[in-house]
């Protein structure tokens, strides 16, 4: 969430850095990863999926049993969204816009529980990579992080450690 991102910048003692990216601080990424892991252990400790406690309590807890295998018929091999993505990225290519595209993973444990197995998810990741590559778009691929601890906030949004990886890669672009 924006609040989490704002807090990340605010609480690291980097308030004086320009948000324009002109001056990128030299973060100790390993130290930040350790710090957010400690925070995540406190904020995602009421479930087996390392989902944020508040999110889990609000959206999952009461219907947990009903959600088992609830998405088992989900398929990612044919979707209108792929065509939309291809159109967008082809426009980016035609306009000679230099960009990178991030593939964000699903929460592997949670997806498995709801019936979307790894092979099914891999279809989506591969299709997205293919579309990006066909349009000469460089990909920052995090799909192999599905089972990394505290990587995701919920089922589909980057969490504590995921943001550290993403931020580190963004800073590499600027440096």
Predicted regions and their residues:
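Long, well-ordered mid-to-C-terminal structural blocks that present hydrophobic/aromatic surfaces
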Residues: 70-72, 80-81, 100, 109-110, ...
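Functionally constrained cores in energy, signaling, and assembly domains
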Residues: 84, 92, 99-102, 167, ...
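Active-site segments of SGNH/GDSL-like serine hydrolases
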Residues: 91-116
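Secreted/periplasmic serine-hydrolase-like ester/acetyl group-modifying domain
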Residues: 1-91
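Long, positively charged, glycine-interspersed low-complexity recognition regions
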Residues: 111-175
């Amino acid at each position: 969430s924006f609040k989490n991102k704002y807090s990340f910048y605010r609480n690291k003692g980097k308030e004086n850095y320009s948000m324009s990216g002109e001056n990128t601080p030299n973060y100790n990424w390993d130290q930040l990863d350790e710090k957010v892991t400690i925070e995540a252990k406190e904020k995602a400790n009421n479930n087996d999926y390392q989902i944020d406690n508040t999110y889990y309590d609000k959206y999952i807890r009461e219907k947990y049993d009903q959600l088992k295998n609830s998405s088992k018929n989900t398929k990612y091999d044919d979707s209108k969204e792929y065509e939309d993505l291809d159109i967008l990225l082809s426009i980016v290519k035609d306009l000679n816009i230099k960009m990178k595209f991030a593939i964000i993973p699903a929460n592997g444990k949670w997806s498995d529980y709801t019936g979307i197995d790894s092979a099914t998810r891999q279809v989506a990741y591969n299709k997205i990579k293919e579309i990006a590559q066909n349009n000469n778009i460089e990909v920052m691929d995090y799909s192999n992080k599905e089972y990394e601890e505290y990587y995701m906030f919920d089922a589909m949004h980057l969490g504590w450690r995921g943001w550290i990886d993403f931020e580190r890669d963004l800073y590499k672009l600027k440096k």
